[in-house]
Curated annotation (Swiss-Prot):
This is Protein N-lysine methyltransferase METTL21A. GO terms for molecular function: ATPase binding; heat shock protein binding; Hsp70 protein binding; protein methyltransferase activity; protein-lysine N-methyltransferase activity. Pfam families: Methyltransf_16. Its EC number is 2.1.1.-. S-adenosyl-L-methionine binds at W47, G73, A74, G75, D94, W125, A143. Protein-lysine methyltransferase that selectively trimethylates residues in heat shock protein 70 (HSP70) family members. Contributes to the in vivo trimethylation of Lys residues in HSPA1 and HSPA8. In vitro methylates 'Lys-561' in HSPA1, 'Lys-564' in HSPA2, 'Lys-585' in HSPA5, 'Lys-563' in HSPA6 and 'Lys-561' in HSPA8. It comes from the Eukaryota. Belongs to the methyltransferase superfamily. METTL21 family. Gene3D superfamilies: Vaccinia Virus protein VP39 (3.40.50.150). It is found in: Cytoplasm. It comes from Homo sapiens. GO terms for biological process: negative regulation of chaperone-mediated protein folding; protein methylation. GO terms for cellular component: cytosol; nucleoplasm; protein-containing complex. InterPro entries: Methyltransf_16, SAM-dependent_MTases_sf.
Length: 218
């Protein structure tokens, strides 16, 4: 849910974005996410990919308790909030312009004892990566962040920096255009990639990626 243009073709699809609150139930909590389509656009609404990825995390598909996780292009922060409620130590990131809105959702939905293990931090892909330790996170999460082709190289550089050989990347997305497949092809040059989930109702895929080790490349 990064700050990118987005095409929504149906009137019904747009209506849900104009609601000031989107309410969800995850991890035995009611989560109320503020939305602000009119003023902040795509970064301030909940996209289907975030819902599907949050559901996948709640299913227990990956171990979260006690693990370090980062959400990229977090937008409203739903995925990071769910990961924190499920026990992860989460860093929730987006560009500077989105941070105050993101913080408001995190503070409204996480109990104080979980907020102490959760960080909201600026991250523009490909920039100032030195503020993050190489291979810092066990789990890297992204929902609907594969979109603008001109960001692909920076996103790959960011993933490469944040991942260790043991890190797991989970990317939730719709495959709308050829450029989406192009990104997956670029990802496969540096990572082992497999599809682990598909939601037919929302037409959202989840891909898991891990760094290729040297033995695989020989």
């Amino acid at each position: 849910m990064a700050l990118v243009p987005y095409e929504e073709t149906t009137e019904f699809g747009l209506q849900k974005f104009h609601k000031p609150l989107a309410t969800f139930s995850f991890a035995n909590h009611t989560i109320q996410i503020r939305q602000d389509w009119r003023h902040l656009g795509v970064a301030a609404v909940v996209w289907d990919a975030a819902i599907v990825l949050s559901t996948y995390l709640e299913m227990g598909a990956v171990e979260l308790r006690g693990r370090s996780a980062v959400e990229l292009g977090a937008g409203t922060g739903l995925v990071g909030i769910v990961a924190a409620l499920l026990g992860a130590h989460v860093t929730i990131t987006d560009r500077k312009v989105a941070l105050e809105f993101l913080k408001s959702n995190v503070q409204a939905n996480l109990p104080p004892h979980i907020q102490t293990k959760t960080v909201v931090k600026e991250l523009t892909w490909g920039q100032n990566l030195g503020s993050f330790s190489p291979g810092e996170f066990d789990l890297i999460l992204g929902a609907d962040i594969i979109y603008l082709e001109e960001t692909f190289t920076d996103l790959l550089q960011t993933l490469e920096h944040l991942c260790s050989n043991h890190s797991v990347i989970l990317l939730a997305c719709r495959i709308r255009y050829e450029r989406d497949n192009n990104f997956l092809a670029m990802l496969e040059r540096q990572f082992t990639v497999r599809k682990v989930h598909y939601d037919p109702e929302k037409d959202v895929h989840i891909y898991e990626a891990q760094k290729r080790n040297q033995k695989e490349d020989l």
